[in-house]
Design a protein with these regions (language model features):
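Oxidative protein folding and maturation machinery
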Residues: 23-161
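Bacterial Sec-dependent N-terminal signal peptides
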Residues: 1-25
């Protein structure tokens, strides 16, 4: 009887902890089965990558496994897409990420960290310039910020062909 109680308690504990573990990983979008070509799947993933992420949840923003690792994976795949698909993904991302100040600050700092650091393995001036172009057009940045962004964009473009 005691063994049965311990066994059931163990499974109840595992069941209670399982949702917590699942919430600590980035909520990737599911690709529709109707998308057959690589280009269609890439475009969908680029534009819908952030659909399940709650930008207003400060706990998700502070969670490195969700916000930072999700962002790192996002910029990694953007570098593999052509410019048009990458730009659509960045536009979809910034439309959501910059609406709230905490998420704007978080992701702006991650963009700087991964793209401005010359030692960063994620550094990619082509993708960085796409982020900066989108930020320069965004209504969520004031004129002073846009001036700084314009300078960074000019510097990033120097390394492009």
């Amino acid at each position: 009887m005691m063994a049965r109680f311990i066994f059931l308690s163990f499974f109840m504990l595992v069941g209670a902890l399982a949702p917590t573990k699942a919430q600590n990983s980035f909520p990737y979008p599911a690709l529709p089965d109707s998308l057959r070509s690589v280009e269609q799947r890439a475009a969908y993933l680029s534009e819908h990558y952030w659909d399940n992420f709650n930008f207003s949840d400060t706990q998700e923003l502070a969670n490195k496994e969700m916000a930072e690792q999700g962002f790192v994976n996002f910029i990694d795949i953007l570098a593999r897409f052509d410019q048009e698909i990458a730009q659509k993904g960045i536009t979809a991302f910034t439309a959501k990420a910059y609406q709230q100040k905490p998420s704007k600050e978080k992701f702006e700092s991650l963009i700087e960290h991964y793209y401005e650091n010359p030692e960063s393995p994620m550094r990619n001036d082509r993708v960085y310039a796409l982020f900066l172009e989108d930020m320069a057009k965004s209504p969520y940045f004031d004129e002073t910020e846009k001036e700084r962004i314009g300078f960074k964009l000019k510097q990033a473009r120097k390394n492009l062909p």
